[in-house]
Amino acid sequence: MPVNLIAVQPSDLLPVPGVRVGVAEAGIRKANRRDLTLIELAAGSRVAGVFTLNRFCAAPVQLCKQHIAGGDVRALVINTGVANAGTGEQGLADAHATCVAVGRTLGVAPEQVLPFSTGVILEALPVDRLIAGLPAAHADLREDGWFDAAHAIMTTDTLAKAVSRQVEIGGRTVTLTGISKGAGMIKPNMATMLGFLACDAAVSQALLDALTKEAADLSFNSITVDGDTSTNDSFIVVATGQAGNAEIADPLGSDFHALRDAVIDVSIRLAQAIVRDGEGATKFMTIAVEGGLDVVECRKVAYAIGQSPLVKTAFFASDPNLGRILAAIGYAGIQDLDVGGLRVWLGTAAEEVLVAELGGRAPTYREEDGVRVMKEAEITVRVDLGRGRARATVWTCDFSYDYVKINADYRS
Amino acid sequence: MPVNLIAVQPSDLLPVPGVRVGVAEAGIRKANRRDLTLIELAAGSRVAGVFTLNRFCAAPVQLCKQHIAGGDVRALVINTGVANAGTGEQGLADAHATCVAVGRTLGVAPEQVLPFSTGVILEALPVDRLIAGLPAAHADLREDGWFDAAHAIMTTDTLAKAVSRQVEIGGRTVTLTGISKGAGMIKPNMATMLGFLACDAAVSQALLDALTKEAADLSFNSITVDGDTSTNDSFIVVATGQAGNAEIADPLGSDFHALRDAVIDVSIRLAQAIVRDGEGATKFMTIAVEGGLDVVECRKVAYAIGQSPLVKTAFFASDPNLGRILAAIGYAGIQDLDVGGLRVWLGTAAEEVLVAELGGRAPTYREEDGVRVMKEAEITVRVDLGRGRARATVWTCDFSYDYVKINADYRS
């Protein structure tokens, strides 16, 4: 059961001028399901991306990095079913063949195509079936194709993940629409997280690159379901430049700040949707760490809490288990942390309870207050390290019977 | 159900000349259970220890570090029930009062006593009950008290953990006996791992210190149940010097090598017993990484595999899920790892199957071979990084429904 994740409606999603989206049933791994998505970008679009750091980086990710560096990207092609990871030279050849076929279909060069795959790893991509499905995806291209695409990129996701919003920039209305997928892991292998965000703003390549990196760090790189990192993770931001605003090139200007806020907002909502749909999730946890010397140490503490199986099972049990949270802070790796100086709160939208200070349980803390907070589905753990002004936030979900069941039983 | 961990028998454990052990029921947290252990060391004993790196280091650990630095330790006192962690100044006062009482009982100074506590954290130590239990523990002191002590230090452990062996050094028989406890975590908080190893060898303090550190790294610091680190973890090695061997002071001599091998062997068996008794464990996994540039990167890879919830649930399901293992290697943090150069085997005592090479599935690998290996209770994952001569081994267990159940349900 996703945690407070509502099924997206077609009317929730706004077309982005300069982007057309089509889907098809290519039978990549299973028949009768939409498993192929084609995204066509108008000439002049700018594209930026960030990719997995896993050394078993999949073949399509390797091609994406090359093609995005060349600039002038005109199409994205996404298949589910097979991740084309751990497939060696054949995998690279298959990903390249995909780009050639898409290029031929759309009348662009193979180097102008970014390929994405998600699904089982260590299996060959059935590239013939993928290519055979391209004409149908091509015929389906339309500006309002986002809703179908959000569904076509799903794997173990239980709900499609998509967000649109608009923002005024330089007197023009800029539209942003994004889709994402990922839910912990994917049968029978790793969970790939994919995020695609398109807007029609005009923005310089340098600022788009920087913004994409920042947005990824604050969204997809700030969530954790089980701490594992996929071979295929990718996050792409497209700016078609068709909104008619003056090109944004000043990182200190108000136009950039408006675009930045909107891109980060949409990215965070797309990333949070992945956690809300985390495998077996029953609670959505925000781990907000402040008062650190730098962001790195704040993230260390947030991830230590958010990835601790003991903390996550305690949240599943609605147990305000302060000891497990404090212990996770203690082993997060800040060598000179003065535990006497930190404070910890458990909170909901309605209240916040100080649970720890001065190296132990807060004198004012009553167990029934913690129990009341822990019954909610959305809980914030706020930690003040009391040694600086940096902060970082990580989102995660709890660890349930169903997590083990989903990940242990998939072949039965 | 512990994995291949056999209940220790009293006759398995050898007295160590110079060490007397006694236990008592002090009612620390529950009545009618042995929860207090006293270990008396003869004059002239040498003691070395390594302790948790958790910043929420418990009060007794803080005192231990001070007292062990002063030398001439004559007693260890261990209580279960309450960990005396996250207890601030009162906790330090309580641990100190414990040492004063033990010193008075045995006629030594408080600074010659090392206190250890394991149990719930954030609760005050009932030091009056502990002290009231000391006369009974004192009256119980005997050379063959190890069997009872192995049981008295248990918390969530399902079986006592104890090992003895003898080794010839300089024409004399040296006896080693050790006990340990720990099983993932302890109601309602963190799992404390405690290990106590005593021998009657004569060895210099400098070599004992170095050996204790090395043995801890190769044993208690090479196991993982859930990746969490306790506030109270401690490992102590005692050498009473009563075996009559010439004092070992040459780190290159054969006497030291014999002692070293024996201490490391006993330490590894004590540490492995903790994994075999891991909460909900159904399989015992050895992660052996070789061919690294240094031990640090080998340990990174071994821990990435051994701590991955996806790998651990796959082992629970007896699923030879190669993709999850490769992905864990890929995100272990070796930035310049050439995945094309590594090889991975799954093995049992009877056979070893090459499953991956050249960046993907090994051409010779057949799924039925992997399935056969994964059905065993003891499985080795061997990884050759193919870039150097360093190696490291980590032991872990699988991740089952019962792990979640034990850690989510303890208050029900």
From Swiss-Prot, chains A, B:
Residues at the site labelled Involved in the stabilization of negative charge on the oxyanion by the formation of the oxyanion hole: 118-119
EC number: 2.3.1.35, 2.3.1.1
Tagged with keyword Amino-acid biosynthesis: yes
Listed SUPFAM superfamilies: DmpA/ArgJ-like
Catalysed reaction equations from the record: N(2)-acetyl-L-ornithine + L-glutamate = N-acetyl-L-glutamate + L-ornithine; L-glutamate + acetyl-CoA = N-acetyl-L-glutamate + CoA + H(+)
GO cellular component: cytoplasm
Record's subunit section: Heterotetramer of two alpha and two beta chains.
NCBIfam families: ArgJ, PRK05388.1
Described purpose of this protein according to its UniProt entry: Catalyzes two activities which are involved in the cyclic version of arginine biosynthesis: the synthesis of N-acetylglutamate from glutamate and acetyl-CoA as the acetyl donor, and of ornithine by transacetylation between N(2)-acetylornithine and glutamate.
Protein name: Arginine biosynthesis bifunctional protein ArgJ
Protein's gene: argJ
